[in-house]
Amino acid sequence: MASFVDEVLIRVSSGRGGNGCVAFRREKYVPRGGPAGGDGGRGGDVVFQVRRNMRTLVHLRYGRVFRAKNGQDGEGARRFGAKGHDCVIPLPPGCLLRDAQTHEVLHDFGHAHEGCVTLLSGGRGGWGNYHFRGPVQQAPQRAHSGQPGQERVVHVELRIVADVGFVGLPNAGKSSLLNFFTHARSRVAPYPFTTRIPYLGVLRTGDGRDVILADVPGILERASQGVGLGLRFLKHLTRCAGLAFLIDLADERALHTYDLLCKELYAFSPVFETKARVLVGTKLDLPNARECLQQLRAQHPSTEVCGVSVHNRWGLDELQEAFVRLSDAGAGALRSPVWRNQAPSFMYAQLEDPVCQVRDDFGATVSLSRKRKVRG
């Protein structure tokens, strides 16, 4: 089975700013060159970048400490130190960043066109002694230390971004439908929980459009309380533009399956109540399936109901059109309830977090009494 990691804890820290330099201008025929100490370079930032070709967080499982480079110290002749290299952490689309201590939402990559975000800024470089020159103090022998970097423990949670998410009991035909439309090679077998991790596939329509389909493991009764695979994979459906409820028409519980699935989804998150949906009756080629499909349509007259058979290729064209309509219903919407309800205020709240507070020694001066080398 392919490795699928959707949650991981990582420690990130930005770079420290370089120290300012104590130096003086020493040139021929310039007896009083004055101070010429350069400023320290700024520390590197911690940047999270979305990459569309990634689907899991397995690359963060074994390397969980990420540090940006420190800024270089200033030098003589007013030469500034180089900025430290940024630490760029690649992420798949749909990730949610939380503070591991306060559980504050730091950033939510639920937006469809989001690229990268700077989570921690590097420390500022210290001033060289050139900044302390004046008519009274013409040869200052002090410089500022660089600002220390910031550090945080971040909980990274992946929530798959898709246009249509498949919801159903085990063995409802979700994987077979995904394989037919997208050639995703999801495993199919006649026993429950054949699908144990989410699978994504791209449905390419005749007019050149792409519709992303997501298949998650089957949902059991009381799944919102931890039964079966429980809550672990229900979160991946929160970002889907629409939901396809797959109902096995040969199951004796078929007429009650939709209510059961809705109950579990609503108990997990109220965001599911407003999502566009379509009911898909599967295994239409089995006995008594058509009668069950008619009863299902009578029970839910306000919801679109489709009947399909992957084995006989029945009703698949109509279902493809329904998937396109679901994708259009959520087009342009921000598929993240966390981002809508919570403003991205972490950039302004950093100094209030004890982890990110500036230390007391920032701005301290360094004199020659500390045996600091003077550069000419």
Swiss-Prot record:
| EC number(s) from the headed UniProt entry | 3.6.5.-
Residues in domain Obg?
A: 2-161
Under which main EC class is this enzyme filed?
hydrolase
Keyword entries, A-Z:
Cytoplasm, GTP-binding, Hydrolase, Magnesium, Metal-binding, Nucleotide-binding
Any one Pfam family match given in the protein's UniProt record, by short name: MMR_HSR1
Names of required cofactors: Mg(2+)
Residues holding GTP: 168-175, 193-197, 215-218, 282-285, 309-311
Instruction: Tell me which residues make up the OBG-type G domain.
Output: 162-328
What's the protein here called?
GTPase Obg
Its taxonomic placement starts with: Bacteria, Pseudomonadati, Spirochaetota, Spirochaetia, Spirochaetales
